[in-house]
């Protein structure tokens, strides 16, 4: 089991190996072990004769070991540190950080730093291989995997969502919890963005170049990205090293949603772009001269009609205002005549009253005269 895990972890994500650089592998394949356990480090270089001399370094200092294998028996805290190796004329290996722990439960990982697409192996390991059951694996404090009986866990293709702090818990005589261990997954390349050489909508007949744009964030010998182009569910072009696709003569049937994929050669890392909408319009025929003549003639007639209507309406409004004024004046004169007639009637009534009073006085005088004569 350990041999298969080691072999799986040793193969790089892109299938390419720098044959001039040494690589350290571990047996068992864990970068953290308990005290008193045994671990062996192997210095490997492809296509290098086995008789080449080997140099080991611990925390930057050369050690006494000159064999391709560096064996640590009954590990102690003093064996913790950064290991590198070099064989013959090869380049010095990348560092391996080995940690020696004390405790009852230990979460073991195959490495602390990964490139996305590489496998991550985890093991919830008890002191002296004691029986552990009801095992839970956690990432950033949240349980994500449960085993009734203890079992190793492998994430075959890591991505940046697997960044975080991992720990495990399990039942023995009691419920035990391991310390946390930080795991970093480096992004190999960002998700691509699909761009077009012309803006949408566009006219039929145009040349359109689609570009699937991304870039490698980590450089490795022989690492190459492959690109595919799609319209909806239709494949326009399969895997190819060119990041461009051309529509030589755009037609209306080329309208649709386009997207692309970028992937490593082995397909371990594959990322899709957001969709890009292209709208192709039919060609517009040139407008004939007679149409322009008719158009401007119609506009002129409409302007003339509007002008005549405006003048007519204005005259009508003026005439109506004058007529309303005359009616108003006539109403005022009529009121004055009525008022004058009412005054004349009042005077006539007063004169009649006065005449009646005078007549009554005269009658009174005539009645008194005969009485005096007697």
Swiss-Prot record:
The chain crosses the membrane at residues 293-313. Residues 16-292 are extracellular. The keyword ATP-binding does not apply. Residues 312-332 are annotated as: Interaction with EPB41L2. It is found in: Cell membrane. It is a single-pass type I membrane protein. Its main location: membrane. InterPro entries: Ig-like_dom, Ig-like_dom_sf, Ig-like_fold, Ig_Fc_receptor, Ig_sub, Ig_sub2, Immunoglobulin_dom. Phosphorylated on serine residues. GO terms for molecular function: high-affinity IgG receptor activity; IgG binding; IgG receptor activity. Keywords: Cell membrane, Disulfide bond, Glycoprotein, IgG-binding protein, Immunity, Immunoglobulin domain, Innate immunity, Membrane, Phosphoprotein, Receptor, Repeat, Signal, Transmembrane, Transmembrane helix. Residues 314-374 are cytoplasmic. Monocyte/macrophage specific. Residues 352-374 are annotated as: Disordered. Residues 1-15 form the signal peptide. Glycans are attached at residues 59, 78, 152, 159, 163, 195, 240. Residues 22-101, 95-184, 190-277 form the Ig-like C2-type domain. SMART domains: IG, IGc2. One of its GO terms (biological process) is phagocytosis, recognition. CDD domains: Ig1_FcgammaR_like, Ig2_FcgammaR_like. GO terms for cellular component: clathrin-coated endocytic vesicle membrane; early endosome membrane; external side of plasma membrane; plasma membrane. Disulfide bonds join 43-85, 124-168, 212-260. Belongs to the immunoglobulin superfamily. FCGR1 family. Interacts with IGHG1. Interacts with FCERG1; forms a functional signaling complex. Interacts with FLNA; prevents FCGR1A degradation. Interacts with EPB41L2, LAT and PPL. Interacts with HCK and LYN. High affinity receptor for the Fc region of immunoglobulins gamma. Functions in both innate and adaptive immune responses. Mediates IgG effector functions on monocytes triggering antibody-dependent cellular cytotoxicity (ADCC) of virus-infected cells. This is High affinity immunoglobulin gamma Fc receptor I. The lineage of its organism: Eukaryota, Metazoa, Chordata, Craniata, Vertebrata.
